């Protein structure tokens, strides 16, 4: 095969007619050579004839954006353009969002699709998808359909190139989405569609037509067991699974007792065949990926948190009117705002005001589910640690906890067990209690439940996983829900000492 001027493919074939009879933009140039237009539709047809040719994105696309694609991202984008319905199982932190954006942009430029619908968790609608679209496809129009139904409908009617919406928001405006003509649907963290009996799954399935492009993305397919693959396969590769779930379950599981099932010996192969076509890169396979990747997840404050947060902020505005702001006062008030954001605030009398943490906890569970190894969670406040570990235990997520009041002997035992045993899966740590000297390379994901105000503590805490003995690429996830959290994380990212700039930061918050 030869590529001619990035426009055509010169193929050597025993029988050129097998191509010229089905591809209008092709012609035989000799008894065994055929020239074919190098387009998306022609390439799909050639692949259907078992003639392996590269995607035209490889030669005909100017890769847009602030950053050049890494090798695995180019390969992923190429794969997606060659499959109308497909899975992308690249691990979290490998940049699959950008790969999907480039692939979609290329298809738009080729006139194959008009616009794309992105369905994802609320926590990454803005911080991941909109941010990445602005970074990699800034020439495209982007909007987020979130809020009351009337607002969502108005946004959809505007027909942006990329429309971002949360899972359960799709049902509210499904008719509007169908009418708007979104011919590519990208589902991020697609494991939320594993249950083919759920209303969420049925709504999505009603939007997927034979001509619809559909890419399902998740780093952890069938994470809870082989039966989870059924709903995903029914969307992308329905011919690869039986019509009914129970028949699929019998294929991949066997009954141990009345309420217990176990995977069959060759269930992984069965799942692999069903979840096709698919591409997967682990972080370790991405040789040009940075050793440490940082991502942000947005978390909405609850109404209770917003009430207390705004009340305290207004009080701060009144107190500083005409007064000199000291670093001590600024640090104290900022600390209280961070406490409210995290889930528990301490009063002057030493009592604790506890807030609803369900929004933040739901996002944390998503991160844990996506992680292929163990997880460290850094939580600056003691009472929040108690709340969090209680909830993890209730949900069956094995965990251990390190706070300042845990003895040195107990810490050593907890660290040893975390490093050498299958459980606990999660270690919840107060940053000041274990930021230095400890090796915790059994984990490759670090979650900051809330930011620390110490640049040194932040760097040292992240270094617990990113150090000698770590065999995997690592991801740091920052959970953020309030203005003060976003500003503190931004300063930490830019390696600015928060303590040195605390007064300036305080003034910013009050503006």
Question: What kind of feature is each model-predicted range?
Answer:
Residues 113, 130, 158, 184, ...:
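Conserved P-loop NTPase motor "coupling/switch" region that bridges the ATPase
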Residues 93, 99, 104-120, 289-313, ...:
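Conserved Helicase C-terminal RecA-like lobe
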Residues 170-175, 224-226, 385-389, 411-415, ...:
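SF2 helicase motor core recognition
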Residues 54-89:
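Conserved pre-motif I regulatory segment
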Residues 453-511:
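A conserved SF2-helicase RecA2
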Residues 78-82, 97-112, 203-205, 236:
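Walker A/P-loop NTP-binding motif
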Residues 124-148, 236-239:
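Conserved helix-turn-beta segment of the N-terminal RecA-like "Helicase ATP-binding" lobe
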Residues 123, 144-152, 167-172, 194-197, ...:
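Conserved helicase motor
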